[in-house]
Amino acid sequence: AASDVYKRQLWDGLDDPYLYTVTARLDNGETETTRFGCRKFEIDPQKGFILNGHPYPLRGVSRHQDRKGAGVAITKEMMEEDMALILEMGANTIRLAHYQHAQYFYDLCDKYGLVAWAEIPYITEHMPEATANTLSQMEELVLQNYNHPSIICWGLSNEITVTTGVTENLTANHRLLNDLCHRLDSTRPTTMAHAFMLDPNDPFVQLPDICSCLLYTSPSPRD
């Protein structure tokens, strides 16, 4: 079934993270309810991130889903504390590193208007025998989180060339992931995070829609 939303109110980041609620009901009486937001965005090389037609500079953090004494078994209250701290520091975007996070936290991103980067746990080292696993995890990530307006990109991997470098098999695996994302979701771009400087003309670097480079720098004294 399909339906148009007329005179829709946009999900507009921190300024107005407006959400709609939709319920699907089957003939047997079963129902499923979800929330979604209406928004459009683009990424321009000169203007940066544009949300609903206006520039929206991104300032953010990366979040791991764990706590001392709790590990990854964190509570909703802990997630809410994380969100409160992120908002208090003035961030408007978040990278959910480097795996599927709890649905409750994606919901919080929608609710409070954080722009989010979601990704799979394909990290540091490429293993050829794990290709099927990476594809399965990416499919689950996209299908489970498609309705979240906060998510604006799918991350293919993180610092994947640290131990293995760029290989033909590595590139092929990322091409499969990239194609899968585009097939499942034509509305969001793909990206990957690089830890080291790579040739910008390398086909591997140019493979996703967005190239993201991590800069690790030590604090330096200032006058």
Give the label of every model feature segment.
Residues 63, 99, 121-123, 157-159, ...:
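Active-site beta-loop-alpha junctions enriched in small/polar residues
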Residues 124-136:
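Active-site-adjacent "subsite" loops/lids of carbohydrate-active enzymes
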Residues 103, 126, 161-163, 198-200:
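Generic structural signal for helix capping and beta-alpha/helix-loop junctions
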Residues 1-108, 112-116, 137, 147, ...:
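Secreted/periplasmic carbohydrate-active enzymes, especially glycoside hydrolases
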Residues 140-167:
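Active-site groove signature of glycoside hydrolases
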Residues 172-218, 222:
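Extracellular glycoside hydrolase catalytic/binding regions
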Residues 120-125, 215-218:
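Short, acidic/turn-prone active-site loops that include or flank metal/cofactor-
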Residues 127-129, 157-180:
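Active-site cleft segment of glycoside hydrolase catalytic domains centered on the general acid/base Glu
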